[in-house]
Amino acid sequence: MSLPDVQSTAPDVRISLTRVGVKNVRKLVEVGRPGKTRPAIFISEFDVFVDLPSSLKGANLSRNFEVIDEVLQQATSGDVKGIEDVCGIVSRKLLDHHEYADRTEVFMRSFYMMNRETPVSKTSCQEVINVYAHAVAQRTNGKPMVRKSVGAEVTGITACPCAQNIMKDHAMHVMEQLEIPEDKISAFFNEIPMASHNQRGRGFLCVETDGDIIVPLEKIVTVLKESMSAKIYELLKRGDESYVVMAAHKNARFVEDCVREMARRVVSTFGDLPGDTHITIRQTNEESIHQHDAYAERKATLAELRDELSI
């Protein structure tokens, strides 16, 4: 006995739908790494969508799960080069499985564990990185065109330059009142940065490219970490803590400075990517002496950033 295919019947209201699919599909993703015996492991959630024509009542959602599982098997065997490639292959295969769809879209949100070493005591610790991937496949003259993106959000520390300069002026006035020689004052400020209020900064970088290009996730994380006042660690011995605090206050940065530094590092790090590569950069600083957060953002193509930076 054949079962009725209700999804293939005509809907009562005949309009097309932009997105139909499933959200928050939890999967363990293992991506093989060249030269490594163990794969990179991502604890992930997927959102998977197709568009739906006005002639169909519903989409066959079980096909989405079949495609995801098939591609995850490829990833474990090393046939997939990165998490954006996972999304790209899924989006392309969805077009094969949903013959009525012209556009498919896949989102992936993951936790990625990285091993770290503290700067002074060399203590081993781990850090959880939020990583993201996205892909869109579109039928163009019968051939699917795929656009992919990969990104990460990294936490660091920033120190406010404004408050630091206020404290420096105050300290200089006190030293002058104590009749400390000018050369001694200059020597002190060269060695010891002044206090300031701090922020926990969250930097985000996303790189969007065409189908066959893979952007190393580790390079994205490095750009983000190097763009704030200092890196932070889950575990710090006293020597490490002193180092981090000193480093942050010797490198005080506004939220705007962080985004501009990210842009500079993106151009120098990913200079081999095509000019039409889309870059999204943003920084959120959670203020310690205010109740609000500070925020800055830049969206541009790589070519536009190169032109502005004259690189």
Curated annotation (Swiss-Prot):
One of its GO terms (molecular function) is GTP cyclohydrolase I activity. Homodimer. It comes from the Archaea. GO terms for biological process: tetrahydromethanopterin biosynthetic process. This is GTP cyclohydrolase MptA. The keyword 4Fe-4S does not apply. Binds 1 Fe(2+) ion per subunit. Pathway: Cofactor biosynthesis; 5,6,7,8-tetrahydromethanopterin biosynthesis. It comes from Methanocorpusculum labreanum (strain ATCC 43576 / DSM 4855 / Z). Keywords: Hydrolase, Iron, Metal-binding. The lineage of its organism: Archaea, Methanobacteriati, Methanobacteriota, Stenosarchaea group, Methanomicrobia. It catalyses: GTP + H2O = 7,8-dihydroneopterin 2',3'-cyclic phosphate + formate + diphosphate + H(+). Its EC number is 3.5.4.39. The keyword Iron applies. It is an enzyme of class 3 (hydrolase). Belongs to the GTP cyclohydrolase IV family. Converts GTP to 7,8-dihydro-D-neopterin 2',3'-cyclic phosphate, the first intermediate in the biosynthesis of coenzyme methanopterin. Transmembrane segments: none annotated. The gene is mptA.
